[in-house]
Amino acid sequence: MTQILLLLLSITMLSSQEKEYFQQEVNYQIDVSLNDEDHTLSAYEKIEYKNNSPDELTFIWFHIWPNAYKNDSTAYAKQAGPRSSFAKSDSLERGFIDSLDFKVNGKQVKWTLHPEWIDVVKIELNEVLKPGQTINIETPFFVKIPKVFSRLGHTGKHYEITQWYPKPAVYDSKGWHPMPYLNQGEFYSEFGTFDVKITLPKDYKVMATGDLVNGEEEYAWLKGLTAFTDSLNSLSKDELKKWIKKSQKTKSLENRPNARSSTFEFKTLHFRQTNVHDFAWFADKKWLVQKGELSLPSRPEPITLWSFYLPKNAELWRNSIEYLHDSGYWFSKYYGDYPYNHITAVDGDLSAGGGMEYPNITVIATMPSKHLLELVIMHEVGHNWFYGIIGSNERYHTWMDEGLNDYSNIRYWEDKYKGENERFVVLELVQDRLGIAKNMKYSWFSYLQYALSAKNKNVQPLNLKADEYTGANYGLNYSKTGVFTRFLHHYLGNEKMDEIMKAYYERWKYKHPYPEDFEMVFKDKTDKGLTWYFDGVFNTTNYIDFSIRKKGRTYLVSNHGTMSSPVEIVFYGKGQQEIERVWLENVENNAEIKSPEKALYAVIDPDEFMPDVKRENNSTKSSIRLHWVWDQPTYYDHDLNLTPWAKYNYYNGLTPGIMIYKGGPGFTGLTALEPMWDLNNEKLVGKIYKVFNYDENNLFGKSSLSIGAMRLHGTKSGNVKYSGSTNTKEVSTNFSFQLNHNSLNETAFDTSYYESGSRFIIAGIKCSLI
């Protein structure tokens, strides 16, 4: 009987917890006009605010984020710092919002600025807003659009109108969430419907969140413009470059900062979108326009794809519709179908990173390569799922959108470019033409971003607010979450991970999940212990470092890291034949595995899913791999990079040769041999050296030991040097100790100044406090 009562009590408690979830509904009507001579917006906003909470509300926090650009005292200005372009700008380049006059249900209300932030205001309600009640809030507002410093802004007559209107802060089960605008730190807003009318000069091309209402004429005009863009894309690469060069010779008068509007005719575009929590729009007269479609099995009508880009970037953006198509396709396949009617990318002048996402639309900064452009478009389109449809609190839990999106980016690249060995090209000249780093994968690129900082003593966990991170650590929300979730995917398997992530999407679309909600979906779908992921990855700075070595007929797996994650061991026989795969759980110190029959060697995580910070000790066998200059290493193999090398000095003259080295990003040291031929004296000269790097957890802090020998410049020498640094908030200490042994060639030096022979020399002992 007691057990039955406890069970009923548990069910009742769970039921009450489920009922605790609520979210407010906020619907907008905004009429806005753009003045492109003064770079201002004049607008009127009406908001329908429905209180779905169980609480009575006496006030509402509002964000008026254009005020972030008003002066040097805002949270944004302080975060940007004294060396930022904003700090060096004048008042004419800055922005603000004013002319606010809030009314609730037709009656004026009192409102005050937040005590710390001038871009947050508090509206005092004349009457208590009870659960289930709806009020109507309205206000005029005027925005001076700043120069592009962060997200909202203009460059000449190019406009990026984002975070531009007064919007209520989120009120959820954890209370109010007022927050100032920041560059490092994104957003959290209520879902609802946006009905926005934009009036501006007729010759602007405009794209925004939502669909045009009665927009047949505007859509027909845009579609007509695609014919010219299609004709450009039919040109050869050289012909297109000539056209771009020619188009850039004539400077557009309409884009000069103080130019008058090129037309006195205006148009009003009416956009509407349901189930979103933000609205952004972009306008430019010069954009080229491309259009495409994405068909999904469950949708009767295709999704329209729009790409708007500047003529100077025509060659780079010619495949942008493909990138939009593939992003929408793969994310829909992974999580659930895209629910809106268009996916759009616009070419921008963004200062807040490589791109920025908004519902239905993303703005992209200039990129150096096609792969990077595809990556950024795909990443920002992916935010329609993680931030857009699943509306987590980006400011408080950055990893929930950026990190899960980064994991999805890796998966996209692996699936789309599987036939090309998942190549990721950052610099086309270096990788495609010179053949350097030609086999670099995007998954390795993401791994490296995490691994290089994982053992840093100043590293921060992922459970902090965005503004609490240093600039270096903020990126871990992307890379660390991405690589560990990819590893979790490998551990659980494709089928199970897909089931879980699709369930997460269905359970939380158009809602505001927290980390515990994300974890609960996994608990509901798998009985595997995932504490190492949900606690170890997000709440600690623990890292993975396993090694393996052979002991007769057994293999010893050792944990040198601070995280006890699962670890996969793969055994191989003759001809690299795979014999068996074994997963070990919770290896805290050491574990022995009996060798399978015919197994000759074993490798930890040969497919490189596990974010082990030191992969050099992950195999009992090492092969020799030769690379031209440098390429992505395996770490545990002998990855030898061959680089043409030459030096010149008075005694030897020109000394051509080659550098053979092992090391680089992700290695704990460097080994190098530099054989060269002395053309003056016709003999072999060169250097050989080895560097051991120690991380900041070492006794002497971050340090290195180098040992080398050289025959060059008329000398034979040996050198041992130990140097390092220790850093605290109060003081930084740099130190070095160096011991040389030199043998001087009497024909290379003036004997009146130098004595030939060999001797030991203490070259330096140095210590400095900063």
Can you say where each PLM-predicted feature lies in the sequence?
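N-terminal, polar/Ser/Thr-rich
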Residues: M13-S42, T155, T531-W532, T643-W645
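Hydrophobic alpha-helical and helix-loop surface patches within well-folded domains
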Residues: E25-V26, F271, P300-S558, S564, ...
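Short, hydrophobic/aromatic-enriched beta-strand segments in well-ordered soluble domains
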Residues: E45-I47, N51, I64-P66, Q133-K147, ...
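A surface-exposed beta-strand-loop module
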Residues: K50, R83-K157, S247, L253-F264, ...
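Solvent-exposed beta-hairpin/edge-strand motifs
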Residues: F62-Q108, T199-Y204
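Glycine/proline-rich low-complexity spacer/linker segments in large multi-domain proteins
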Residues: D72-S85, F142-F194, N214-E216, W221-L222, ...
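Hydrophobic helix-coil surface modules that form long, contiguous segments used
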Residues: P168-W176, G185-M378, Y407, G419
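Outer-membrane beta-barrel initiation region
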Residues: W583-E585, I593-K598, D605-L699, N734, ...
